[in-house]
């Protein structure tokens, strides 16, 4: 990034309109009535064209500095780029291309209309930049120029509307809010006594139809996720993988768990982060970066602000440990309804890189072994089992052991790299029983496992073995010719693992204390898993 006096300030992309005016304030304000002007209207096609414009303009050296227009629109983008480069900018709102006439200057400056980029270019490169924009039919307006006075000068024709130091606008003073630990946390970690479940097979099928667990294919199939013919691993399992132009592959996944974050905001946030990393690792990718979207209630409430701060501490702590940088993010406050605030909801997106051939799970065959990596603990707190089956949110939230987390990840990546596994799937929502069922559902083959072989803490109940959502666990599908090599490799790593059983037949069978405690056919499990969410959304 650099800029010289006399360089031109150019706005490219979508037209500026009333949509999105005050959008960031709207996202951080108490909702008392509907405000349509605050809702941005996206256009993915224009966004794609802008990406092409930026890439070509970069290659033609038409860009000295650049900033996307997000929260606050032009008012923030212009002041922030001026402050960061130590320059001044004079701009004219009359030169901004708009969707409609009659927009007031303050509306033009604060509109958050989507798909817009601010570019600083050399005068000599302006015509080249315009030609590139014309090629992709993207609008391009010269709205100002660079000065040396470090001031933001906003004009309408010859009339000065604002003249302020760019630093004053870009570096707003920080607000030191009060925080206090929520009172509800004092008793929520106590596990209430729950009724005995007579039929665990029915319980498993019920959980497979839970909206939080059931397949989301009804949603993502409504958008063509193969545009550009770059999708190598499609959405619906652990993470998606895209082919990049440089021959490498990009793995991407977003995860969140409000129930865990409600019980323990810090550990819940770490768990979301680790789950996203696990999913990326399951595709053979090494996590290289993350983004977050932090959604909370009213930060003026000390208890809500405490949950926000705890979540941030957890995310920061795990990011530093893994050395995975946070490359972007978004915060949305005041998410409340008449019934109260939402649960603390950090969403974590993780990107991973695969340098060579991507890991594509191969077909599961009868006789393939099922191996688990990771330890199951007394951590049913915030589980799908507790909420969906027993209508209870509480108990001991899963805690990430940083050492186990890293060594388990690296071990899985090594197994994939050495082509010793046919597929990898992480254990998360619903616990071991759901992860195992998903392997059978996607492989269209039954399984026969002995849950007594599960690496775990002592004296865990059958329900906790099945449905605890302990972190850092992976299920591996291993060909019989490789099983001894896998066992030798994992034994040397001194991590918790075991061979639980094999794939065979057309039933999901789980043995406990020498008896089959769960038996259900694959076709019924598939119907529950694939059809429930669509039926619910279509028919209520």
Language model: regions and residue ranges:
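Mobile "lid/hinge" segments at catalytic clefts and subdomain interfaces of large enzymes
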Residues: 1-136, 144-151, 155, 170, ...
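Short loop/turn elements that form and flank the Walker-type P-loop nucleotide-binding site
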Residues: 5, 173, 235-236
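Bulky hydrophobic/aromatic packing residues
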Residues: 12, 256, 308, 465-467
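Non-catalytic terminal/interface segments that mediate subunit docking, oligomerization
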Residues: 22-25, 181-423, 428-433, 437-458, ...
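Glycine-/charge-enriched secondary-structure boundary and capping motifs
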Residues: 70-208, 318, 322, 327, ...
């Amino acid at each position: 990034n650099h800029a010289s006096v006399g360089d031109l300030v150019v706005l490219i992309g979508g037209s500026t309109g009333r949509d999105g005016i005050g959008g960031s304030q709207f996202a951080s304000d108490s909702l008392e009535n509907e405000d349509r002007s605050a809702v941005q209207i996206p256009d993915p096609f224009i966004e794609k064209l802008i990406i092409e414009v930026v890439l070509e303009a970069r290659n033609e050296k038409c860009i000295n500095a650049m900033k996307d227009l997000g929260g606050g629109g032009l008012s923030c983008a212009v002041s922030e780029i001026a402050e960061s480069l130590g320059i001044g900018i004079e701009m004219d709102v009359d030169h901004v291309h708009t969707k409609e006439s009659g927009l007031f200057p303050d509306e033009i400056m604060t509109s958050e209309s989507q798909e817009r980029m601010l570019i600083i270019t050399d005068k000599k490169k302006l015509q080249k930049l315009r030609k590139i924009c014309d090629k992709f039919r993207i609008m391009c307006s010269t709205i100002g120029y660079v000065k040396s006075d470090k001031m933001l000068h906003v004009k309408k024709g010859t009339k000065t509307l604002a003249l302020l130091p760019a630093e004053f606008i870009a570096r707003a003073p920080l607000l030191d809010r009060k925080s206090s630990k929520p009172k509800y946390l004092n008793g929520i970690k106590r596990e209430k006594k729950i009724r005995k479940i007579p039929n665990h097979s029915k319980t498993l099928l019920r959980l497979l139809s839970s909206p939080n667990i059931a397949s989301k294919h009804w949603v993502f199939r409504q958008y063509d996720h193969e545009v550009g013919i770059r999708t190598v691993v499609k959405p619906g399992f652990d993470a998606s993988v895209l082919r990049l132009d440089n021959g490498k592959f990009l793995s991407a996944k977003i995860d969140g768990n409000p129930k865990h974050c409600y019980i323990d905001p810090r550990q819940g946030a770490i768990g979301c982060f680790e789950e996203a990393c696990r999913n990326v690792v399951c595709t053979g990718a090494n996590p290289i970066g993350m983004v977050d979207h932090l959604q909370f209630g009213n930060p003026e409430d000390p208890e809500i602000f405490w949950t926000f701060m705890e979540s941030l501490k957890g995310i920061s702590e795990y990011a530093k440990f893994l050395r995975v940088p946070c490359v972007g993010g978004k915060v949305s406050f005041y998410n409340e309804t008449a019934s109260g605030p939402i649960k603390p909801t950090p969403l974590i997106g993780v990107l991973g890189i695969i340098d060579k051939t991507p890991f594509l799970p191969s077909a599961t065959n009868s006789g393939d072994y099922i191996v688990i990596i990771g330890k199951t603990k007394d951590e049913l707190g915030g589980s799908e089992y507790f909420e969906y089956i027993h209508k209870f949110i509480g108990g001991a939230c899963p805690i990430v052991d940083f050492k186990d987390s890293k060594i388990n990840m690296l071990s899985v990546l090594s197994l994939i790299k050495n082509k010793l596994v046919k597929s990898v799937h992480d254990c998360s929502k619903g616990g071991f029983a759901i992860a195992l069922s998903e392997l059978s559902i996607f492989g269209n083959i039954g399984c026969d496992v002995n849950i007594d072989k599960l690496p775990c803490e002592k004296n865990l109940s059958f329900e906790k073995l099945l449905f605890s959502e302990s972190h850092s666990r992976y299920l591996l599908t291993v060909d019989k010719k490789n099983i001894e090599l896998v066992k030798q490799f994992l034994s040397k790593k001194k991590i918790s693992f075991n061979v639980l059983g094999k794939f065979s037949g057309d039933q999901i069978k789980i043995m406990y204390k020498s008896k089959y405690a769960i038996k259900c056919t694959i076709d019924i499990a598939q119907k529950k898993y694939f059809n429930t969410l669509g039926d619910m959304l279509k028919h209520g």
